[in-house]
Amino acid sequence: MNYLVAMEAAWLVRDVDDIDDAIGVAVSEAGKRLNEAEMDYVEVEVGATGCPACGEPFDSAFIAADTALVGLVLEMDVFNAESPEHAQRIAKSEIGGALRDVPLKVVEVFETEADEDEAEAEA
């Protein structure tokens, strides 16, 4: 089975004054580290947090003392996994290897369609 695994990462950015700068730096640094590990197939986006008062989503970023904590969402397709749990372990191992010392948490796993070549091979 094929799965899309979405993970949340907590990215620390130092010496920033602005939320938008912190988000840009976090996405850029994460993308750079993934590309250096030849993992350009991992999607990197800023996460969203729901407002406790109105429920409206806003960017997951917070600045205190010129240091930002940015919540990133990392998505990776995992092919030929035996189960959703197996897909989670594969994704966490792959991404965790490239992003050492970055806290990761699996937030969702979706089963995806097999592409046409795989569907024909299984038939």
Swiss-Prot record:
Protein origin, superkingdom: Archaea
Database matches in InterPro entries: UPF0212
Listed Pfam families: DUF555
Similarity remark: Belongs to the UPF0212 family.
Protein name, UniProt field: UPF0212 protein rrnAC0441
Source species of the chain: Haloarcula marismortui (strain ATCC 43049 / DSM 3752 / JCM 8966 / VKM B-1809)
